[in-house]
Amino acid sequence: MIYFVRIWLSNGDNLHDKVFHFKKNFPEDATEQEIDEYFQDTYQNLYNAFFSIYEPPKDGGNYCGWKYISQSEYEMLI
């Protein structure tokens, strides 16, 4: 099963925004939890790296996240 994900990171200043798109093939017997955990771990690693370089949002907001996207959306964006 192939999954597509967008991860976005921002500290709210619109100068250092980063967006990543991933395509990952999982075994047919992979559970939803395993897939979610894989992408959550990927997101968390990128989040930690991003905020080791850039200051966190001054307003305390959260401008980061991740979501599943369709194959057509992925292909349009890469």
Where are the predicted features?
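Low-complexity, intrinsically disordered short peptide segments enriched in small/polar/basic residues
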Residues: 2-4, 16, 32, 50, ...
